[in-house]
Amino acid sequence: LKSKKGRKGEESRKRLLNAAANEFAIWGFHETKVSEIVKRAGLTQPSFYLYFQSKEAIFEELINDFHSRVRKLTESLLLENGLHTEDVSKRVLSAVETVFQCLAEDKDVTKIGFFLNPEAKQMKKDLAMALKENLEAEQRLGYFHSELDMETVAECLIGMIEHLTDSFLLTGIKDPGSLAAEVVNLLIYGMLPKGSDVR
């Protein structure tokens, strides 16, 4: 059983992380001040320095947590062997929706990790490579046609997710389910009329 002091410390640290995420998302890194983070968290400035060495340290922790969460998620979304053709689009829909749900979970952290992070471009490249590996494995299982260059597909998917997150998800205009359905309809069924989609 954790001590009361240990629990309180964890709660204070979490409040600081949440407050910092909100401040960074609103003001950006350079305009955010430690004094505003502690004010928003309802704590004192000395308490901030018990948990974080600097504004840079808390910013970096938010980014690293986001990157780690998204990377683990990407790696976990590999389609299993033995799916029937009709189940592939349902599983892809579920996977894309899961990604959008993850990004919608904490919009402030998503804004920081995906857009404000100076390393965001490299992080998206890393995610695209992990996604490419998944897609190539799924291609070998016969789920997608063999002529597709999965590196291009992965880059397109990351680009779509990034832009739709910025335009619709973070603004609350569309929810994860509807965005996922639109992405999957486009990628799986294309733009030509066929009479079937994932709705």
Spell out what each predicted region is.
Residues 61, 72-105, 157, 180:
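Hydrophobic alpha-helical connector segments
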Residues 12-21, 37, 62-70, 131:
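Generic hydrophobic, amphipathic alpha-helix propensity
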Residues 68-71, 75, 94, 102, ...:
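Amphipathic alpha-helical packing segments from all-alpha helical-bundle domains
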Residues 52, 114-119:
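Short helix-capping/turn signature of helix-turn-helix
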Residues 4, 15, 23-57, 61:
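Helix-turn-helix
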Residues 110-115, 139-186, 194-199:
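Hydrophobic/aromatic-rich alpha-helical bundle segments in the mid-to-C-terminal region
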Residues 1-11, 195-199:
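N-terminal intrinsically disordered/low-complexity leader segments
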